[in-house]
Amino acid sequence: MGSSVTVSITNEIDLERIARILASALPSHAMIALEGDLGAGKTTFTKFLGAAIGIPSNEIVSPTFGLIHIHQGPTQFTHIDAFRLSGVEDLEQLGWDEIISQCGWVIVEWPSRIALALPDDRLTVSIEVTGETSRRITLFSESSRFDGAIDALLIATHGG
């Protein structure tokens, strides 16, 4: 069945708050599929998520041309931009099996490009542009491992 929560935000301060809440409640090993149109705030959200665990936000940039960036912090933080990937074959060349078997967080922007390779055990974060600075953020997972993160955001934004 899965669980989900949707939150409307009006600015980047709200986005940062959501990232901090999520960071405090994610399991130590997590796959995050980050969906949204170009300019929706996927990389900004990723910067805030990394900053919440002590990775300087200036170190987190879009890996569009490098495809993958690995950051060491209290939790290994692997950031992948799948926009330029053609599919699973390209992932194998990046060492996908090793990446997803390591402890830490794996954040994938443009997950639809590699949908067949994504594990079912993941959290999907969808960022929808609703205005110049406003967004609708939806967290969804079929896995009960992410119930704590979804519940934490639900409690923080809707009061339970």
Q: Which residue stretches match the model-derived regions?
A:
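N-terminal pre-Walker A segment at the start of P-loop NTPase domains
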Residues: G2-I21
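Short beta-strand-centered segment that lines the nucleotide-binding/catalytic pocket of NTP-utilizing
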Residues: I55-H71
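Phosphate-binding P-loop
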Residues: L22-H29
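Hydrophobic anchor at the beta1->P-loop junction of P-loop NTPases
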Residues: I32-L34
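Short phosphate-coordinating micro-motif centered on Lys-Gly-acidic
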Residues: S3-V5, L91, D97-G160
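P-loop (Walker A) phosphate-binding loop of NTP-binding proteins
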Residues: D37
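Conserved lysine of the Walker
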Residues: K42
